[in-house]
Amino acid sequence: MRGNIHVKTNIIVFAFKGQLDAFSEKQFKNFITNNLKNEFSFVIDLTKIDFLDSSGLGALVQTAKECKKLKLGFSVVGNSRVAQTIKLVRLGDFLNLKSSLEDALNYLKN
């Protein structure tokens, strides 16, 4: 899994490629944790993730909880496979799942 960061109107966008699974979960958590200090709302863009398993879902849930605790806005964008997995376990609302980066950015601006 690889990730990069860019900022759009005071919202940090974390874009990831590859797989978010048991093998990459620690890397994902470290990447996010190191950037939570910025105190900006953020989007996790998973549109280029090929595979998401229960460990990846757990990392997303933990990230959402941490954001709520810090009062940071948070949203997830996923491709159809990622969205299907998130919806299957009924985490769409909790993770503020959006269908596009534009929708996620608009959600966080309001």
Q: Which positions does each model-derived feature cover?
A:
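STAS-typified acidic loop motif
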Residues: R2-N30
